[in-house]
């Protein structure tokens, strides 16, 4: 009976959100309302039944139909969107003629900002005096640590040359399912090969190239149609996800890890400010960027998926920031698997500095710091973009530094809370790379960038 009431409350709130849609309330406003309602519902459930209660445990599978169902739909569109977005980038003549230069700037920005993120993570951890042995480990943390060790053991069986080979797409259709940890970068590589093939065809067989371009444009339009349908479900997905996250969170554990949570968000905010400084150094107004990117960053924050944010990422760059479609498609897509500032930069660097003292290593020695920064930057290749990316990056970094991986499990109770900020920073990093690259290559439409954002929403109701 109580479970039925809990589910009914969620459905009533979903109906309320639908009514707001019927009244033409802006998409971004409905997402924020869903976020607040989800938090309040989660707090209400936990206050009524208590953390870990049977009522909450029995209710969550029903909430997951909406929450996890929404995440599954985001995963469904991620790979096709990455594939067609990069392929479409090559049909734009501007990027076709300047591909090498554009790719260099995008990769340099993504990897460079990841290295900077690692430095910020190291500095913040030192400033807050964080150490892994200061944190109490319960059953959940120990179980998480054991799971990470098991996963690391399977990864350690593969040599470095084999890991590099794994980046290549032996079966692109298999990688389009996202079945491997490196599937995203494999799809990117396959798309790039097809893109170069298109450029060759366009030089020799113009009529065939025109037909191919029309086909790519048609598929892109079809995929984007599916994307828009899925994105319209965002308020309902966010409502269920936030209700579940808050209802199942152990606030006692979060309070005990409050120092780490605060340190993490300080680091994430500092890196975001660095993004703004980079834009300012190229002669752009960073305040304009903040105003125009906020809606997309809020979506990334609440959904916790960089891949699911890709369509909004690209649309924000092209329609609001003046980035050509080719550069926006490439920076957004590459940013899903390379140089994620939050998940592959700040987080593993903080963990490495926290864990090092437990095995007698001074984390402030120059040799250790240089090793952390270098390994973090290199290991940012191939990080997953729909959940689990930070864990994958942490295992790679800790393994390379020969640090105990099990201690990474101590943060499981605050993982969802921190992951929200990390995801938003990942998306900001890829957008900054796109805008900066367009600026440096002379492709940025500064008139669009400096024009106040129109009332047209990113996601149509």
What are these regions (language model features)?
Residues 1-9, 13, 18-22, 28, ...:
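Signature of multi-pass transmembrane helix bundles
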Residues 40-48, 112-140, 263-300, 305-309, ...:
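Transmembrane alpha-helices that form the ion-translocation and gating core
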Residues 61-72, 101-105, 166, 174, ...:
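Short amphipathic alpha-helical coupling elements at transmembrane boundaries
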Residues 78-82, 234-237, 305-313, 343-350, ...:
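Transmembrane helix boundary and interhelical junction motifs in multipass membrane proteins
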Residues 83, 188-191, 292, 327-335, ...:
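Alpha-helical transmembrane segments of multi-pass membrane proteins
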Residues 180-186, 266, 281-289, 321-328, ...:
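Membrane-interfacial loop-to-helix junctions in multi-pass transporters
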Residues 299-378, 446-455:
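Helix-loop-helix junctions within the multi-pass membrane cores of secondary transporters/permeases
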Residues 425-461:
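Cytosolic juxtamembrane C-terminal amphipathic helix followed by a basic/polar low-complexity tail immediately after
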């Amino acid at each position: 009976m109580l479970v039925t009431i809990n589910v009914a409350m969620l459905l009533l709130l979903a109906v309320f959100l639908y009514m707001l849609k019927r009244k033409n309330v802006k998409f971004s406003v409905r997402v924020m309302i869903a976020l607040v309602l989800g938090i309040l519902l989660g707090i209400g459930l936990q206050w009524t039944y208590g953390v870990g209660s049977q009522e909450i445990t029995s209710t969550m599978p029903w909430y997951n139909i909406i929450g996890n169902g929404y995440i599954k739909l985001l995963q469904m569109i991620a790979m096709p969107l990455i594939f067609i977005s990069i392929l479409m980038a090559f049909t734009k003549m501007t990027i076709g003629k300047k591909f090498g230069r554009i790719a260099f700037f995008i990769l340099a920005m993504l990897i460079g900002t990841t290295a900077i993120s690692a430095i910020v993570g190291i500095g913040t951890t030192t400033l807050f005096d964080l150490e892994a042995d200061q944190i109490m480990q319960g059953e959940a943390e120990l179980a998480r640590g054991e799971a990470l060790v098991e996963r690391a053991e399977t990864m350690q069986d593969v040599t470095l040359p084999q890991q590099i080979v794994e980046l290549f797409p032996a079966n692109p259709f298999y990688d389009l399912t996202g079945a491997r940890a490196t599937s995203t970068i494999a799809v990117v590589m396959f798309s790039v090969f097809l893109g170069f093939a298109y450029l060759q065809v366009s030089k020799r067989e113009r009529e065939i190239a025109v037909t191919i371009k029309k086909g790519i444009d048609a598929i892109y339009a079809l995929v984007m149609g599916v994307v828009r349908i899925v994105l319209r479900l965002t308020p309902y997905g966010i409502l269920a996800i936030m209700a579940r996250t808050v209802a199942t969170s152990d606030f006692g554990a979060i309070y005990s890890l409050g120092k780490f949570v605060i340190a993490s968000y300080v680091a994430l905010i500092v890196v975001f400010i660095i993004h703004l400084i980079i834009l300012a150094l190229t002669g752009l107004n960073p305040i304009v960027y903040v105003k125009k990117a906020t809606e997309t960053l809020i979506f990334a924050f609440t959904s916790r998926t960089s891949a699911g944010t890709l369509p909004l990422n690209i649309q924000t760059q092209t329609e609001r920031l003046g980035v050509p479609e080719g550069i926006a498609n490439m920076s957004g897509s590459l940013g899903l698997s390379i140089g994620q500032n939050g998940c592959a930069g700040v987080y593993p660097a903080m963990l490495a500095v926290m864990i090092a003292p437990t095995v007698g290593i001074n984390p402030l020695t120059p040799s250790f710091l240089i090793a952390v920064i270098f390994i973090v930057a290199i290991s940012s290749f191939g990080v997953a973009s729909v959940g689990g990316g930070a864990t994958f990056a942490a295992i790679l970094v800790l393994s390379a530094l020969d640090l105990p991986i099990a201690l990474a499990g101590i943060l499981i109770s605050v993982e969802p809370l921190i992951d929200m900020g990390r995801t938003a920073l990942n998306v900001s990093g890829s957008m900054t790379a796109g805008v900066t690259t367009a600026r440096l290559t002379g492709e940025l439409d500064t008139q669009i960038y400096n024009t106040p954002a129109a009332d047209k929403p990113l996601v149509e109701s």
